[in-house]
């Protein structure tokens, strides 16, 4: 998953991205929703710009669109960092990369980061609770029931993100 650039379906809607720009994809990955393989709903190529008007970098990145909610708008993967020659420093909430007129530094916001982390933790707890309920019944010993539970969970997250 860390090699993917992810864009959440709600973010796509809020950005007003024309649906004709979204291409079909069969990309799947694990690790965002515990115990569930996620299927991307499409992909879109977007221009991403970092810096200031006099010192900036611009690259086109392919984002895979995911059908669930998050406290984030998008996640950049290793390929994005490599394309920009960027180095993230998570403890200081900074991203640095070379620019045409010197180093470009993108600063994070500590307060907003903490709020987002709390929101994401609440979503993870909700998913974990839902999985626990689904897998605690005796019927889940059958493999087809496990597949159904995962599918129901993904559909539930899709429905919630469309309502938001």
Name each model feature, range by range.
Residues 3-163:
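Aspartic protease core domain of the pepsin/retropepsin superfamily
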């Amino acid at each position: 998953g860390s090699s993917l650039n992810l864009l959440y379906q709600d973010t796509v809607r809020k950005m007003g991205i024309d649906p004709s720009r979204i291409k079909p994809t069969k990309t799947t990955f694990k690790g965002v929703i515990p115990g569930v393989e996620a299927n991307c709903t499409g992909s879109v190529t977007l221009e991403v710009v970092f810096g200031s008007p006099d010192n900036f970098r611009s690259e086109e990145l392919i984002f895979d669109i995911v059908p669930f909610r998050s406290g984030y708008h998008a996640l950049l993967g290793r390929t994005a960092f490599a394309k920009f020659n960027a180095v993230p420093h998570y403890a200081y909430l900074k991203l640095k990369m070379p620019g045409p007129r010197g180093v470009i530094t993108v600063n994070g916001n500590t307060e907003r980061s903490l709020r987002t982390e709390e929101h994401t933790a609440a979503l993870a707890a909700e998913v974990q609770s839902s999985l626990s309920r689904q897998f605690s019944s005796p019927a889940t010993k059958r493999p087809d029931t496990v597949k159904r539970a995962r599918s129901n969970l993904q559909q539930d997250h899709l429905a919630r993100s469309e309502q938001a």
